[in-house]
Amino acid sequence: MESLPTTVPSKSERRARSSKFSQSSSKPSVIMAFFSCVAWLYVAGRLWQDAENRVVLNNILKKSYDQKPKVLTVDDKLMVLGCKDLERRIVETEMELTLAKSQGYLKNLKSGSSSGKKLLAVIGVYSGFGSHLRRNTFRGSYMPQGDALRKLEERGIVIRFVIGRSPNRGDSLDRKIDEENQARKDFLILENHEEAQEELAKKVKFFFSAAVQNWDAEFYIKVDDNIDLDLEGLIGLLESRRGQDAAYIGCMKSGEVVAEEGGKWYEPEWWKFGDEKSYFRHAAGSLLILSKTLAQYVNINSGSLKTYAFDDTSIGSWMIGVQATYIDDNRLCCSSIRQDKVCSVA
């Protein structure tokens, strides 16, 4: 048999085949490298973007932190408000108050009596601009005039009509009171008090403060000008109470707090008196008496004492917070039927 001829590839053919094989095998590598570069660029771009976002976020947080109110100390607040000088004056006032308390609460005391001796009582008769006739009636019945008034003061009793100033300072109302006082010399004019119905509860603070600052007495008495007063009977009652420290004397009462707006005796802050809506025990406002120490307490703390709609309940609220001795004396109940009472409803 004849053998088949064998074809041996030439050298050039082997090179061509090798080149084709290498070209076909390198294409996937190039593609993979390309996608790797794309992925790297994508990741790098995201990282760069995240870095920029973090920078922006940090700037925002820094700005918001700078704008956030800082926690200030008391000294910082005082500096901001310019209150350093006020702080110093408060400390000085507290020191003066401590000194005043140690000296019996009184400073630069002026005596209302000609002899300078201590008085038994200062009686303040509440009056108003439209009460000229009432004052004349009171003078004609219970209040001495001229030399008799001076003799009464020598006995240790000072009695004055108590009135504030007009809302329109210096008007005809003020001038009439000044003229009446110049003629009668029986007024205690409260220069810092505005005489008005809605300010009546505050008037009692100004009265006790002015009375304490002008006269040194054992008792300070608030009286309405619409009652009949037995002056000698009142003096006898006071004589029997001499030496009773921190005495709060009057016709003690309590009663329902009126919560209906527009009603008589309406109390705007009725809710402060509890669910039962009942007033605490207090002396009726027609005639009430404070001993020297209690009147001094009102004088010293008048700037911070809370007032309610009426002066008698306001005083009663002040007495709750101190060691006051409550004395319920029926002779001071002006509407009672007792024969020895010292006042009665006019």
UniProtKB/Swiss-Prot annotation:
Signal peptide: none annotated. Residues 1-28 are cytoplasmic. Expressed in roots, rosette leaves, cauline leaves, stems, flowers and siliques. It is found in: Golgi apparatus membrane. The chain crosses the membrane at residues 29-45. InterPro entries: DUF4094, Glyco_trans_31. Residues 1-21 are annotated as: Disordered. It is an enzyme of class 2 (transferase). This is Hydroxyproline O-galactosyltransferase HPGT3. It comes from Arabidopsis thaliana. The gene is HPGT3.
